[in-house]
């Protein structure tokens, strides 16, 4: 009976996470602003002058970066590590929400199994 309750609860959590990510994407698309609508139009014009007409692309995983915005993917972060006294920042995939949910489910099942013994 407890196992059924855990399975149902985990399925509900997965459904909630999936629906919230869809809602966030829809919200972001609705609130997307054009350059003319932003107040920092001057900054965008300076960026255009520096980069020229070439398109900006994201940095792939395990390559150097400066901040999270440069890395490809939703769950990829610019993480710092120290090597020989120097700080190196690399884009790393942190797994996202799904990985955390699955890890939580795995821990819950193992705790239930250990309680039965």
Curated annotation (Swiss-Prot):
Keyword Disulfide bond (UniProt): yes
Pro-peptide region(s): 21-56
Keywords: Disulfide bond, Ion channel impairing toxin, Knottin, Secreted, Signal, Toxin
Keyword presence, Signal: yes
Disulfide bonds, paired cysteine numbers: 58-72, 65-78, 69-115, 71-91
GO CC list: extracellular region
Composition bias, Basic and acidic residues: 23-55
Gene Ontology MF term list: ion channel regulator activity; toxin activity
Domain notes: The presence of a 'disulfide through disulfide knot' structurally defines this protein as a knottin.
The name this protein goes by in its record: Hainantoxin-XV.2
Organism: Cyriopagopus hainanus (Chinese bird spider)
